[in-house]
């Protein structure tokens, strides 16, 4: 239950980055926080850019 599993069809990084909140694809703390509560803290730009 820790990290979300990658989807079968993975969008290009820019796409994933753009809809990060909706797709919940990133294997970072975002995925965990996303499930717990709707409101997710935005990560700093450097971290957010990495998919």
Swiss-Prot record:
Keywords tagged on the record: Chromosome, Developmental protein, Differentiation, DNA condensation, DNA-binding, Nucleosome core, Nucleus, Spermatogenesis
GO CC entries: nucleosome; nucleus
Protein name (Swiss-Prot/TrEMBL): Protamine-Z1
Domain of life: Eukaryota
Basic residues bias spans: 33-51
Chief site of localization: nucleus
Organism this protein belongs to: Scyliorhinus canicula
Subcellular location: Nucleus; Chromosome
Keyword Glycosyltransferase: no
């Amino acid at each position: 239950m820790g990290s979300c599993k990658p989807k079968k069809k993975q969008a290009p990084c820019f796409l994933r980055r753009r809809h990060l909140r909706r797709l919940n694809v990133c294997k970072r703390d975002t995925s965990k926080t996303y499930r717990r509560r709707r409101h997710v803290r935005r990560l700093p730009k450097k971290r957010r850019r990495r998919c």
